């Protein structure tokens, strides 16, 4: 629900200090901690722990933060804190934060009965369905002949032997940069994820088998190995309970906040010019 502006996010970033924070850089004698950087980029990281990021990513974020800090230092040197535009933007940010606090106070008063959550699930079970999925690898090549040659190389192989050889050929021959280094691995996907000719061929296979003819798509010619499959199934209530509750809570919040706004409007003296 929180929708802080960039200005507000910049203002509040780094307010909370962690006693275990580690210094990652100094800027003109001022220490920069990993906690400051982590909190500043929290909206972008979306729950990822800054400390667990690869070193090159951490360095890039630290550098961005340092640039932001240097701009801030330069702005202060120019005494822009007294600039009318700064004052205007600061007041606007404060107002936005105050409205968010007001709305969150109302949201926190709303409680959704557990029976109502279960009833919603029972009435909408058709919406809570896991689609059928397959796990597959593929080898993408430019010509039909190349695909046929690969199929011939794989002919007669089964189980681990087939899987190992398929991965080897994918790394050697596939022109799909997104999967070749993983041995052609595509992971799990449903029927809406891939182009139709590919999906139709993958779903038609038995687990542990490959396509016996090349599969043509707009990308080229594919050889597909179906590794595993999952049938369509009902998502359990416990898996979606929190999401349903949050959704119902937000719908109730919209009604409450709209009514509150209407009541305030009705009680105010408004003159349109």
UniProtKB/Swiss-Prot annotation:
Keyword Cytoplasm belongs to the record: no
EC number(s) recorded for this UniProt protein: 5.2.1.8
Any GO MF annotation of the entry: peptidyl-prolyl cis-trans isomerase activity
Domain of life of the organism encoding this protein: Bacteria
InterPro entries for this protein: PPIase_dom_sf (IPR046357), PPIase_PpiC (IPR000297), PPIase_PpiC_CS (IPR023058), PrsA_foldase (IPR050245)
Domain PpiC per the UniProt entry, residue ranges: 131-228
SUPFAM superfamilies in UniProt: FKBP-like
Keyword presence, Isomerase: yes
Entry-linked PROSITE patterns: PPIC_PPIASE_1, PPIC_PPIASE_2
Assigned keywords, A-Z: Isomerase, Rotamase, Signal
Catalysed reactions listed for this entry: [protein]-peptidylproline (omega=180) = [protein]-peptidylproline (omega=0)
Residues spanning the signal sequence: 1-21
Pfam families xrefs: Rotamase_3
Disulfide pattern: none
Protein name stated in the entry: Putative peptidyl-prolyl cis-trans isomerase Cbf2
Native organism: Campylobacter jejuni subsp. jejuni serotype O:2 (strain ATCC 700819 / NCTC 11168)
High-level lineage: Bacteria, Pseudomonadati, Campylobacterota, Epsilonproteobacteria, Campylobacterales
Gene: cbf2
């Amino acid at each position: 629900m929180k929708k802080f502006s960039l200005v507000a996010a910049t203002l509040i970033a780094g307010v909370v200090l962690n006693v275990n924070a580690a210094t990652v850089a100094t800027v003109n004698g001022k220490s920069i901690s990993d906690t400051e950087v982590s909190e500043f980029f929290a909206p972008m990281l979306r729950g990822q722990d800054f400390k667990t990021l690869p070193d090159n990513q951490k360095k890039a974020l630290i550098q961005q933060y340092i640039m932001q800090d240097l701009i801030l230092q330069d702005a202060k040197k120019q005494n822009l804190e007294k600039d009318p535009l700064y004052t205007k933007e600061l007041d606007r940010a404060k107002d936005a934060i105050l409205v968010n606090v007001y709305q969150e106070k109302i949201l926190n008063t709303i409680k959704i009965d557990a029976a109502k959550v279960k009833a919603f699930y029972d009435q909408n079970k058709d919406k809570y369905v896991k689609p059928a999925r397959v796990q597959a690898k593929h080898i993408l090549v430019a010509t039909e002949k190349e695909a046929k040659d690969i199929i011939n190389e794989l002919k007669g192989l089964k189980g681990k032997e087939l899987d190992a050889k398929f991965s080897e050929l994918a790394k050697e021959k596939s022109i799909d940069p997104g999967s070749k280094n993983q041995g052609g691995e595509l992971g799990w996907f449903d029927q809406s994820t891939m182009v139709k000719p590919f999906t139709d061929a993958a779903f038609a296979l038995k687990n542990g088998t490959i396509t016996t003819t090349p599969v043509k798509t707009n990308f080229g010619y594919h050889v597909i190995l179906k590794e595993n499959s999952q049938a369509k199934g009902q998502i359990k209530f416990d898996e979606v309970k929190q999401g349903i509750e949050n959704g119902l809570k937000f719908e109730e919040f919209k009604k409450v906040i709209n009514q509150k706004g209407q009541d305030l409007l009705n009680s105010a003296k408004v003159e349109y010019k």
